[in-house]
Regions:
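HhH-family (HhH-GPD) DNA N-glycosylase catalytic core used in base-excision repair
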Residues: 1-186
Length: 186
């Protein structure tokens, strides 16, 4: 179902969020995915037994990745889930504007997508080990999804950056500035 909603949007879009990395195209469809995820979340039924009013057959939300923005990579780095080379840390700390689609920007965003997918898979494995009932993703694949992980991490990053919350119990690195780029895709 996510493909059915995103498809017309992507087909009718006049431009794409694409870049080149090692001789191949990289497409990041953040806006299309957010469209589906926000519609799904905004109209989510009060009871899980009720069908979704916009996606009665299921939104296939589990097919979406995280949204590859600037905030989630920041918290993933803080949590030691992704690491940055010293050269990139220097760029971030200097608040240097990255060119849209450059190697650094694509690397940060792509690493975040991969990292959140790995977090999702680890969560599914832990749920399976903990309790047979928890291993299910849900009837519509939404119990443990990259979309919900993205929502949580984005909010967590803001709270940590603003000093409203701190991470305890695990080793973290100092929270770094977000990467900066001028783009309509964020």
């Amino acid at each position: 179902m996510a493909d059915e909603v995103c498809g017309p949007y992507l087909t009718n879009s006049t431009s794409t969020n694409a870049g080149w990395h090692t001789f191949s195209s990289v497409f990041i469809w953040k806006r299309a995915q957010i469209l589906v995820a926000e519609l799904w979340a905004a109209f989510y039924p009060a009871s899980p037994s009720e069908p979704h009013p916009l996606f009665p057959a299921g939104a296939a939300i589990h097919q979406l990745t995280m949204f590859a923005d600037y905030r989630v990579p920041q918290i993933l780095h803080h949590l030691n889930i992704i690491t940055y080379p010293p050269s990139l840390l220097k760029i971030l700390r200097g608040q240097v504007m990255l060119e849209t689609g450059c190697r650094e920007e694509l690397s940060i965003r792509s690493a975040s997508i991969v990292a959140v997918e790995r977090v999702r898979l680890a969560m599914l494995r832990l749920a399976t080990e903990a309790d047979e009932d928890d291993k299910r993703e849900g009837e519509d694949g939404t119990r443990i999804s990259s979309v919900l992980i993205d929502f949580y991490l984005w909010d967590l990053a803001k709270r940590v950056e603003n000093g409203e919350e701190s991470i305890t119990g695990i080793a973290t690195v100092p929270i770094e500035p977000v990467h900066r780029t001028r783009s309509i895709w964020y």
